[in-house]
């Protein structure tokens, strides 16, 4: 049980890393349309973010310190450092913007911010479970109401402007 949460998070990150590398390979310096019908711009930013994802996996600490709370309601990972959590949030937002641009506001910012704020202020050590919960809720919502993020007035489109990717 001790390594199960680590393995799940690592697999989740590896899937995102593969997506970043796929965008880089398919469309270096140009755009391509994903299987979901979303236009993506590929390039160095995808490679950079993919490597950052691999570094995230290498920097996960304290996974043998994971335990279940006394009331058996929460999985706690108290050794998960705030530095890792913030780095993961930044990396994951970059991933959603690069590879899931229609999800970047809701899935990226809102769902990353909720477990991070909870972890910092009132649910110490509960970040991983809160992150899993917010991700699961979003995935279920997105599957039931796919047009919310794709075509409604709440849809958020990426600029897909090559200039924004090549000039810092």
PLM ranges: what are they?
Residues 42, 157-163:
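Non-cytosolic membrane-interface motifs at loop->transmembrane helix junctions
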Residues 166-167:
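Conserved small/polar residues in nucleotide/adenosyl-binding loops
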Residues 2-125:
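Generic multipass alpha-helical transmembrane bundles of integral membrane proteins
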Residues 23-31, 125-132, 151-159:
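A cytosolic-side transmembrane-helix exit/cap motif
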């Amino acid at each position: 049980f001790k390594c199960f949460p680590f393995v799940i998070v690592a697999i989740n990150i590896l899937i995102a890393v593969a997506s970043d590398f796929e965008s880089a390979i398919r469309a270096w310096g140009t755009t391509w349309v994903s299987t979901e019908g979303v236009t993506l711009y590929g390039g160095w930013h995808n490679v950079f973010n993919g490597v950052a994802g691999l570094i995230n996996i290498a920097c996960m600490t304290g996974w043998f310190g994971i335990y279940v709370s006394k009331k058996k309601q929460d999985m706690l990972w108290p050794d998960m450092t705030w530095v890792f959590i913030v780095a993961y949030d930044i990396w994951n937002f970059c991933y959603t913007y690069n590879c899931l641009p229609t999800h970047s506001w809701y899935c990226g910012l809102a769902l990353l911010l909720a477990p991070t704020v909870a972890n910092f202020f009132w649910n110490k050590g509960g970040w991983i479970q809160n992150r899993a919960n917010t991700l699961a809720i979003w995935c279920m919502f997105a599957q039931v109401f796919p047009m919310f993020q794709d075509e409604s007035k709440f849809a958020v489109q990426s600029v897909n402007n090559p200039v924004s990717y090549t000039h810092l």
